């Protein structure tokens, strides 16, 4: 009995110590508290700032451990989306995110034993095949696309289009789809559909923008990821904007969504989706 008690005591003392010495474990612990003290869709910055600091330490101390990279990108996204409404603050956060994303893709290419230059020369399907053996490839391309897209939004969509931001978001989303179209509630289709919804169509820069593709990609996202609130909101918005004859369908999508309750693990994220759904429904009340 005594050895068992001693072992339990040892474990109770060493597990918190492990969380303190391993920056990713420390970041995960802070990330789990990200919604503490939230008011609806607005989170307090403290917990996610703690997570960001821990993940940044992980990237600095263990750069080849790619888990730290994608978790840093995820935490930066949360900070930019859910803790501030300041455009200047968002620009800084998402600029920081896209820089971390590009550095992360460099390390991903190295892990996959392919040069970054060669990776960029491959088609999305070929690039996905080149990095498929690296488990972190999917979240790295997901969050890289997100940061580039959101940085483009706050920087200015027209200016971003002329700088090739849309091309980068499209490529990363297509690589993610080639890796796993179901990943994170069909995130690749969600990102690609959102891009085709919001990106301005600028000759010689974003001539590939296709509003019908926006709807088809978002329908695919809803089909593969019905539990993701944003899939529904984004589809409804695309229908209102580009297929107004289907406005009744869009309203029905939103009405069904706002009857749902947020899950505890995603309370802030889903509260924001519901706020956006209600605003969109009010705007297109019919």
Give each language-model segment a name.
Residues 284-286:
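Short, solvent-exposed mixed-charge patches
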Residues 22, 26-56, 72-138, 142-178, ...:
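Short coil/linker segments at helix-helix boundaries
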Residues 4-16:
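Bacterial N-terminal signal peptides
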Residues 63, 109, 135, 181-183, ...:
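Short coil turns that delineate tetratricopeptide repeat
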Residues 68, 140, 185-188, 231:
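TPR alpha-solenoid repeat register
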Residues 221, 230-231:
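Extended serine/threonine-enriched, polar tracts that run as long, contiguous segments within proteins
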Residues 17-21:
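Boundary at the C-terminal end of the N-terminal hydrophobic targeting segment
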């Amino acid at each position: 009995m005594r050895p068992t008690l001693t072992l339990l005591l040892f474990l109770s003392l060493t597990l918190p110590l492990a969380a303190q010495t391993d920056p990713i474990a420390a970041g995960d612990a802070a990330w789990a508290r990200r919604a503490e003290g939230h008011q609806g869709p607005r989170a307090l910055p403290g917990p996610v700032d703690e997570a960001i600091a821990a993940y940044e330490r992980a990237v600095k101390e263990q750069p080849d451990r790619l888990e730290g990279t994608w978790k840093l990108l995820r935490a930066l996204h949360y900070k930019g989306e859910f803790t501030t409404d300041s455009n200047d603050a968002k620009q800084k956060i998402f600029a920081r995110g896209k820089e971390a994303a590009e550095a992360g893709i460099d390390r991903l290419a190295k892990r996959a034993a392919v040069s970054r230059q060669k990776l960029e020369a491959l088609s999305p399907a070929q690039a996905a095949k080149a990095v498929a053996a690296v488990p972190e490839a999917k979240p790295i391309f997901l969050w890289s696309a997100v940061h580039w897209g959101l940085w483009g939004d706050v920087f200015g969509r027209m200016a971003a289009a002329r700088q090739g931001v849309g091309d980068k978001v499209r490529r990363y989303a297509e690589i993610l789809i080639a890796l796993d179209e179901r990943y994170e509630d069909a995130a690749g289709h969600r990102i690609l559909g959102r891009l085709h919804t919001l990106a301005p169509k600028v000759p010689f820069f974003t001539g590939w923008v296709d509003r019908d593709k926006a709807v088809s990609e978002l329908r695919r996202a809803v089909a593969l990821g019905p539990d993701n609130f944003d899939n529904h909101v984004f589809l409804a918005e695309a229908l209102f904007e580009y297929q107004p004859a289907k406005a009744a369908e869009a309203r029905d999508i939103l009405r069904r969504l706002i009857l749902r309750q947020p899950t505890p693990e995603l309370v802030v994220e889903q509260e924001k989706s519901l706020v956006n759904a209600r605003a969109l429904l009010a705007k297109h009340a019919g």
